[in-house]
A protein has these predicted regions:
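Short intrinsically disordered, low-complexity coil segments enriched in acidic
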Residues: 2-4, 40, 63, 112
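Short, low-complexity intrinsically disordered segments enriched in A/P/G/S/L with frequent Arg
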Residues: 2-3, 16, 23-28, 32-33
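Intrinsically disordered, low-complexity regions enriched for glutamine and histidine
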Residues: 3, 19, 34-37, 51-52, ...
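General secretory precursor processing signal
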Residues: 11-13, 553
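Generic alpha-helical structural signal
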Residues: 24, 28, 36, 563-565, ...
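Membrane-proximal alpha-helical anchors
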Residues: 35-102
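N-terminal leader/targeting and pre-domain segments
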Residues: 68-75, 81-91, 99-589
Length: 589
């Protein structure tokens, strides 16, 4: 028997055109021969009997019943005057979505489409404008402010009712999404809510909240494929402890007050690009399992990403932080981009770990920049960075290349105890001392590379230091170049040079370079006696106010030209117990 196309319109039934043309079914105007009339009538009776049976199957009856319940629930849900009735409609709609998704008599695509239509109805309610949303913070206060327009008490009640209905929708969706996620992810704790068996197809549905006015808390809820693009959050936006599955978008969202994503979990891609946070933005302890984009975001209030974990790429390119930004103990497994970012307040990256490349090129730090005790596992790119106040890299480790070429440092730069295991480039960098403001009075104006360790080549060629710079106890394991650098004063007491050192075309404006021990706790600068004597080059520019005073020193039957007071050492004479080299030459003279 050919497949029937059924239409409920006016009780008519339509047969496929192909079946009519093939003669399998009667068509308009068909008249059987007299000898076939009895046989044809019998066949038609069988056909319509089968059709009635097909129409009245339990599955068909259930589906028709759902459509009727949907119509009734929708009428309840759209009732704008009775919150209890609206809530009843919302519960029914959510339950109907469950029923469609678990109806195995239908193909998956049909089940998904029926459920998606219901979800679109619910999310459409969330997107509906609500005039009182903009007055949320006023209406949530205890007393009406002076000059309030309208009935304050009545508006308070109306706002609470609308908040209840809309948040209940999120809670009903969250309950189902949490159950589905908990059943598919091993090790997850079971959700505190109990629910009947749910279809995993809930995870395939789309939840469009784009452009919605959100004026209620959404903490500790579950979201799936949630689109909050261009949404406006009135009053505090609370996503504390929320869990997001599927791609999530907050692109161009407007947060009019404080926003909390503290402890939130983003299990897939999330985008906040072009969003605006007017108040404080709290992402401390948040977990990002996939790529996260905060590109071009504006943070007007304080931003807190302390203890945040990014397991993939983290993109903050061209973002603007107008107040303090706390990224202390940040952990990024993928490429972290802060390129061309503007930090208006203090930027703190203390004890952070960047496992892959970290890009800060062309960023501007208007207040102190603190990277102390951080670890850069991949290339650290700070080319062209501008720091207008102190820059703190004390105890920082650079496991790969560190590029500060063309960087501009102002006031106080501290690389004390930093370790550079890859090539370190400071070529054309500027270390500038500007007139102090009251805010900067506690910081001496100099650059500090004391105890810094450079395991590979170090390049300070054409760098400019308009403040005194100290390389006390610095360790240059391989070649270091200061070719063309400009100094006010440079101090290399107790520094160790393992291979070549190029000081040609240097300039010293106020104080001659010092390689001698100025204090008891310091020793003279040391140059390896196993290096090429031609690799140590000391030649100031003719116009330099101060130059090098050089002499000779001998060790291992080799003679070197060194600055007066510096010594040669034998790298093979290291005494582990005494923590010093035991074969040292007399000072150069």
């Amino acid at each position: 028997m050919p497949r029937l196309h059924i239409s409920c319109r006016r009780g008519l039934f339509f047969y496929p055109a192909r079946a009519r043309q093939s003669g399998a079914l009667p068509y308009a105007g068909y008249k059987p021969a007299p000898e076939q009339e009895g046989h044809t009538a019998m066949n038609l009776n069988k056909l319509f009997t089968a059709l009635r049976q097909h129409k009245n199957t339990p599955a068909r009856n259930q589906q028709a019943g759902r459509h009727e319940r949907y119509t009734h629930a929708l009428e309840q849900f759209l009732d704008g005057h009775q919150p209890a009735v609206r809530l009843g409609g919302a519960y029914t709609l959510a339950n109907l979505a469950d029923e469609w998704l678990t109806d195995t008599s239908l193909p998956e695509q049909a089940r998904r489409e029926e459920a998606q239509a219901i979800i679109d109805t619910l999310t459409g309610c969330i997107r509906t404008p609500y005039p009182l949303a903009q007055k949320r913070q006023v209406l949530e206060s205890d007393e009406a402010p002076a000059g309030y327009e309208g009935d304050f008490t009545r508006d308070q009640e109306a706002l609470r009712e609308e908040q209840l209905v809309r948040r209940t929708i999120f809670m009903e969706l969250s309950r189902r999404l949490a159950t589905v996620a908990g059943s598919t992810e091993k090790g997850n704790r079971k959700d505190k809510h109990t629910a009947p068996p749910l279809s995993p197809m809930w995870a395939d549905l789309r939840f469009d909240f784009g452009g919605a006015p959100i004026f209620y808390p959404l903490q500790q809820l579950h979201f799936q494929n949630a689109d909050f693009a261009s949404a406006t959050f009135y009053g505090p936006a609370d996503f504390f402890g929320a869990t997001f599955h599927g791609d999530t978008s907050f692109s161009a969202a407007q947060f009019t007050a404080d926003a909390s994503f503290h402890g939130a979990n983003f299990n897939d891609w999330v985008g906040f690009s072009a969003a605006h946070f007017a108040g404080a933005a709290e992402f401390s302890g948040a977990r990002f399992a996939d790529a996260a984009s905060f590109a071009t975001v504006t943070f007007t209030g304080e931003a807190d990403f302390s203890d945040a974990l990014f397991s993939a790429a983290a993109d903050f390119g061209v973002a603007s932080f107008e107040a303090d930004a706390d990224f202390s103990r940040l952990n990024t497994a993928g490429i972290a981009s802060f390129a061309a970012v503007t930090f208006g307040g203090k930027a703190v990256f203390t004890a952070s770990t960047f496992h892959d490349e970290a890009h800060f090129a062309a960023s501007v730090f208007n207040r102190p920049a603190v990277f102390s005790k951080s670890l850069f596992g991949g290339a650290a790119r700070f080319a062209g960075v501008v720091t207008k106040q102190s820059a703190m890299f004390r105890g920082t480790s650079f496991a790969s290349a560190a590029d500060f070429s063309g960087a501009s440092f102002t006031q106080y730069e501290d690389f004390g105890g930093a370790r550079f295991d890859g090539d370190a480039t400071f070529s054309r960098a500027s270390f500038i001392a500007l007139p102090r403001t009251r805010y900067e009075m506690d910081f001496p104006q100099h650059a500090n590379f004391g105890n810094a360790a450079f395991a590979q080549g170090a390049d300070f060629s054409k760098a400019t230091f308009t403040a005194h710079v100290g390389f006390y106890k610095a360790m240059f394991a391989r070649e270091v170049s200061f070719n063309g650098a400009n100094f006010e004063g440079a101090y290399f007491a107790d520094a160790t040079f393992g291979q070549g050192a190029d000081f040609r075309q240097t300039s010293f404006m106020y104080v001659k370079p010092s390689f001698e021990a100025l204090e008891r706790r310091l020793q003279r600068a040391r140059f390896s006696a196993q290096a090429d004597p031609q690799g140590y080059l000391f030649e100031a520019r003719p116009e330099s106010a101060h130059g090098f005073s050089c002499g000779t020193a001998e060790l291992l039957n080799r003679t070197f030209v060194l600055p007066i007071g510096a010594v040669l050492y034998d790298p093979d004479s290291w005494d582990e117990e005494k923590q010093e080299y035991t074969r040292i030459s007399e000072p150069a003279q």
